[in-house]
Amino acid sequence: MTRVLGIETSCDETAAAVVTRGADEAPAILSNVVLSQIEEHAAFGGVVPEIAARAHVEALDGVIEAALAEAALSLDEVDAIAATAGPGLIGGLIVGLTTAKAIAAALGKPLLPVNHLEGHALTARLTDRLEFPYLLLLVSGGHTQIVHVAGVGRYERWASTIDDALGEAFDKTAKLLGLPYPGGPNVEKAAAEGDPARFAFPTPLKGEARPDFSFSGLKTAVRRAAGELAPLSEQDVADLCASFQFAVTQTLADRVARSLERFGKEHPKLQQPALVVAGGVAANAAVRGTLEDLCRKKGFRLVAPPLNLCGDNAAMIAWAGLERLESGLKQEGALAFAPRPRWPLDESAAPLFGAGKRGAKA
């Protein structure tokens, strides 16, 4: 039995977890502790990197202790240490990776620097024991990507956003409409009380052959509609959110369909290919419902993590570390590995350019 301690500090969650794979090959989460910084950043309407880094410094030791206690383990009983080394906010990455290095060096245990995006990419194998290959739709505050996942460390990016990430569009829409931080969940909550047919927002890139995404025009349409209605009533806000969210789901359905078709052609012998949706936006019920309908029509199975594993967490980091350890992909010179604020999952792909491809977590 291999037990890996995972540490995640790439943005505004301080997290630690212990994950294992038993003799029966079944993975298990022994603990998963996440301390959010929502209160620290709420007054600013978004994450302030300096505040986030300081909060990680103050909280990380206690979070690690809590994860070990929940797993009923001591540090000596952990077999390896995995930590997010990028992409993300540099201050937070330094805190988590430096702590992991200190623990690994003191105990003489392997250190596994993990790409945060790989954590999301492999979560479905932790929760559903999914076999390779599969298609990944990664939707979060920093990313909107479609990735072909052929194995551990074997990723090919098929599509990405040409401007804003989807989670970023949710957050900016929330801020525009005066909704509190975090934006995504509050837009979804308001949308539940709104009329999605009131505003006919655009479906960016609809019908285009390329599979990429675009969300900046949708965000601009919301701003224009809100400006024409100002001052906004509570129902106006709800209707704007509902119409925005509906346009998002229609955009996803149109864009993702192209990659599903390509995947089916490249893997014709798979009886029921899988689409994995991961990242914070994967917690949105409307997004999940739309993708379920799309997969049903295309002969795919939708695999979505439990809600507590959609956002940033350390269980996915520990699991990615365990997968790399078992695949013989240990990082040479890990103790000297520098945090990487920009670290693409598919390092062979062309660099991302443009306002929404600025790479904070690309």
Curated annotation (Swiss-Prot):
User: What EC number(s) does its UniProt record assign?
Assistant: 2.3.1.234
Instruction: Give the family per the record.
Output: Belongs to the KAE1 / TsaD family.
Q: How is the cofactor bound?
A: Binds 1 Fe(2+) ion per subunit.
The residues the record assigns to binding substrate are: 138-142, 171, 184, 284
Q: Which reaction does it catalyse?
A: L-threonylcarbamoyladenylate + adenosine(37) in tRNA = N(6)-L-threonylcarbamoyladenosine(37) in tRNA + AMP + H(+)
**Cofactor(s) needed for function:** Fe(2+)
Put simply, this protein is called: tRNA N6-adenosine threonylcarbamoyltransferase
